[in-house]
Amino acid sequence: MIVDTGSNYLTAQSIFGYAHSIKSDNSCKVVNTELHFDHIGGNCFFRAKNIDIHAHPGTQRTPDEFLANKKEFNDTIPDPIRRSKNESDAFFLKTDLENPNRSIAPGNTFDLGGVNVDVIASPGHTRFNLSFFAKSDGVLFSGDCIVSHYLPYLGAVDISAWEVWLQSLDRIEDLHPKAIVPGHGDIIKTSEIGKELDRMRKILTDAINDTNRDNL
């Protein structure tokens, strides 16, 4: 199972290469945890190979949003000459928008041939975030519901979604994972899970409290 396809075609090509090198005759099951382009940008590589992409039905973007993402990326290039030449085109080489073509929902299970992976609702970072839990191994792929060391991005949603996000963290903790593969950052080992979840909770709680104070 490949969880998220990276930002672009070339990233997805590398991910596929690693997966293929482990066991070349394995079929690929590909899932997206969310709709942000750093998670779905490489979908085009897999769809070109006729490999299905599974995700929440809300994981859909428009061509205009994809073009805006490319422009935003280009605008972050510090060098004005490189920026004026649209150097981001190199980053997005061969990359086209491909939305997931197979819908999944919390409660679904993937049978990977001896390992079952459960689909877990983990909204908050976006309203449609999913996580994936291989219970027999105790490994949870959290997407951006959890990031280690990084600060989570809160700007895609509002305070009501942050409160839902806290519930998602509780749901994940109740699964008692042995390891968490976050959306960004290092793999979180058993001994670090409680600390990382508490760090995420504090960031979200502080943001909620600050917003409530501003609204008084």
Task: Tell me the role of every PLM-derived stretch.
Residues 3-6, 27-36, 54-57, 121-123, ...:
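Active-site neighborhood of phospho(di)ester-bond hydrolases with catalytic His/Asp-centered motifs
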Residues 49-52, 133, 139, 161-215:
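Divalent-metal (often Zn2+) His-rich catalytic cores of metallo-beta-lactamase-fold enzymes
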Residues 103-134, 139:
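Core dinuclear metal-dependent hydrolase active-site scaffold
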Residues 9-10, 35-41, 60-64, 126-129, ...:
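Active-site environment of divalent metal-dependent phosphoester hydrolases
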Residues 65, 71-72, 150-160:
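Acidic/histidine-rich helix-loop elements
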Residues 10-13, 17-105, 109, 202-209:
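Active-site HxH/HxHxD metal-binding segment of metal-dependent hydrolases
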Residues 6-7, 153-157, 191-195:
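Short, solvent-exposed loop/turn segments at secondary-structure boundaries
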Residues 1-23, 131-144:
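Conserved beta-strand hairpin/beta-sheet module of binuclear metal-dependent hydrolase folds
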